Structures are given as structure tokens and as C-alpha cells.
């Protein structure tokens, strides 16, 4: 399943992509009409939280099938052209990112890879697919892109052993870890350089892990104005997904909806010769196999 959150006519909602259609089932409406008893989570985060005790996907499947068989299915669908995409989840807790997890990317920026490099991004930096974000020209001339695979946590845990780590994953998404290289080079920590408004585009979907059975062998392609800048594969990650979860959960309790960005391959603007940073009016597309394409526009003004 592909889950998404959206805004329609000033109403915020969430849903699941209609198969073979550019449309979404509006799940709160579907659940209200066809759901089991009082099961009607109002947000995707609430659905993930309830998934710890109840099979959320099964509840979705049964309700959608009932809607399809009712003959009134069009009442519960919205076309993508009629909605604004939001971040699939807005975590109440953590947006955690791993840096220097691709050796070629670390090398292009002359960074060491012999130690764990972890940082957080402010939840206020999150934005959805097709969003236009500030160009931040008032503070930097070095705004950069980083296409990444994102892990979405599905159940609570800490000190999770590597052998059980994959059980804590609900699904995967796409993240563009937009970075202010000026701030990054002038501060010892990464939080400020990674947390500008709009600096964490995410989406367009959360793809459930059953639909991405080999997340460590998917291509990541980032294009700026249709020019390929990054062309990597998650198989190149230094620390694999189960290792990332084991290492971070040793210190940080994870909860449903928490996001872990797994690092970016080579090809960022700062690593090119000469460097090529994002400019007003640019279009950035990050595509990951079997998830989709995350599009971000840099404001002209």
C-alpha cells in the first residue's frame, strides 16, 4: 500500500493510493462509512500508533473493499490534481538523519567515514511533494540537495538488536535532505544547516515494507531541472538498515511515525566541479524505485 497525507478544500486528511489511478481513497471518510465499529484514526500517525495492537493495513483493506463493492466508490476518492500533498507523517518525536553513509558522497566532500555521524532535522522543516520552498538567499548562496531513502518506524522500541530491527519498520519514503552548506561549514553541529524552512521535503508516499522487499537494492536518482545529478543505489550504504536502527535505538527510543534518513549518494551540488548549488526557480526531483518521485520547487522570489 502507498499511504499519503493531503489537504483538500482547506481540510487536512490522509489516505491510500487507488491502484492504477492517480487518486487517493480518503480514509477517514471510508472508515466512517465502512470501518469496523469505532476504528477511524484521524491521521496517518494515529493509524500507525494503533497498528501496534491492530492490523492497520487489514482495516484499510477491508474498508476499501467495502467501499468498492458499495457502488458509491467515487464518493470516497479524490484525484491527485485536486489535492495538495503534505508530508505523509509529521512526527511528534524524531526526524533522525545519518550522514556520510555512502563512501563516495563522503569522499566528494572530503569527510571522514570512520565514525557515526547522526543529526536531527526540525519537524518544522518538513514539507510535502510538489511544494515550493524558500530559496533562503537572505542567508546562503549554497543551498544544496541530498536525495535519500527514508525509513518510517512502525512500533515503539529501544535498544533494538540488529536481528529484530526490520520488524520495527512500517515502510519507506523519499526524503530530500536540503542543506545550507554555508552553515554546515561554519558550525560544529548540523542541526542549523539542516533545519531551514522547507528543508525536509518528504513523500509523496509511505510505501509499506511488503511492497519494497529489497530496500537495500533500489536506485536513487536526483535531477535538477531534468539534469541527473545523483545516480546511486542503496546497496552502496556503509551501514545497512538494520545496523542504523540498532545503533540509533541504543540511545534513542523510537516510536511509530519516527523518520530515519539513511544518507545520500555522491553527486550533491557541493561535490561537483565547479559546485552547482540550487537557484531560485529550480526544480528538484528525487526518484526511488517502487516508491515514486518527490518533486520540490525553489521559490523564484
From Swiss-Prot:
Alphabetized InterPro entries for the sequence: Fumarylacetoacetase-like_C, Fumarylacetoacetase_C_sf
Entry keyword Metal-binding: yes
Keywords, sorted A to Z: Metal-binding
Positions bound to a divalent metal cation: 146, 148, 177
Domain of life of the organism encoding this protein: Bacteria
MF terms (GO), sorted A to Z: acetylpyruvate hydrolase activity; metal ion binding
Any Pfam family the entry gives: FAA_hydrolase
Family membership: Belongs to the FAH family.
Protein name as annotated: Uncharacterized protein SERP0556
Organism: Staphylococcus epidermidis (strain ATCC 35984 / DSM 28319 / BCRC 17069 / CCUG 31568 / BM 3577 / RP62A)
Amino acid at each position: 500500500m502507498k499511504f499519503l497525507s493531503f489537504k483538500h478544500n482547506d481540510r487536512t486528511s490522509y489516505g491510500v493510493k487507488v491502484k492504477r489511478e492517480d487518486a487517493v481513497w480518503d480514509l477517514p471518510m471510508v472508515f466512517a462509512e465502512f470501518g469496523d465499529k469505532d476504528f477511524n484514526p484521524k491521521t496517518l500517525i494515529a493509524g500507525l500508533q494503533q497498528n501496534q495492537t491492530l492490523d492497520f493495513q487489514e482495516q484499510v483493506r477491508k474498508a476499501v473493499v467495502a467501499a468498492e463493492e458499495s457502488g458509491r466508490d467515487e464518493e470516497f476518492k479524490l484525484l491527485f490534481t485536486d489535492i495538495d500533498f503534505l508530508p505523509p507523517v509529521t512526527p511528534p518525536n524524531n526526524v533522525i538523519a545519518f550522514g556520510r553513509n555512502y563512501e563516495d558522497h563522503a569522499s566528494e566532500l572530503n569527510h571522514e567515514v570512520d565514525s557515526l555521524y547522526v543529526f536531527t532535522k526540525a519537524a518544522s522543516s518538513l514539507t510535502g511533494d510538489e511544494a515550493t520552498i524558500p530559496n533562503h538567499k537572505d542567508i546562503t548562496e549554497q543551498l544544496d540537495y541530498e536525495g535519500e531513502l527514508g525509513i518510517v518506524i512502525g512500533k515503539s522500541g529501544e535498544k533494538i538488536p540488529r536481528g529484530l530491527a526490520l520488524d520495527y519498520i512500517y515502510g519507506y519514503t523519499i526524503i530530500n535532505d536540503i542543506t545550507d552548506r554555508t552553515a554546515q561549514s561554519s558550525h560544529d553541529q548540523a542541526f542549523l544547516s539542516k533545519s531551514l524552512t522547507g528543508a525536509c521535503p518528504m513523500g509523496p508516499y509511505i510505501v509499506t515494507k511488503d511492497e519494497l522487499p529489497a530496500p537495500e537494492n533500489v536506485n536513487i536518482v536526483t535531477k535538477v531541472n531534468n539534469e541527473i545529478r545523483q545516480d546511486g543505489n542503496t546497496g552502496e550504504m556503509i551501514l545497512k538498515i538494520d545496523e542504523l536502527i540498532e545503533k540509533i535505538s541504543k540511545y534513542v527510543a523510537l516510536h511509530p511515525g519516527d523518520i530515519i534518513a539513511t544518507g545520500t549518494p555522491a553527486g550533491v551540488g557541493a561535490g561537483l566541479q565547479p559546485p552547482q548549488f540550487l537557484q531560485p526557480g529550480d526544480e528538484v526531483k528525487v526518484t526511488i524505485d517502487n516508491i515514486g518521485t518527490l518533486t520540490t520547487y525553489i521559490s523564484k522570489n
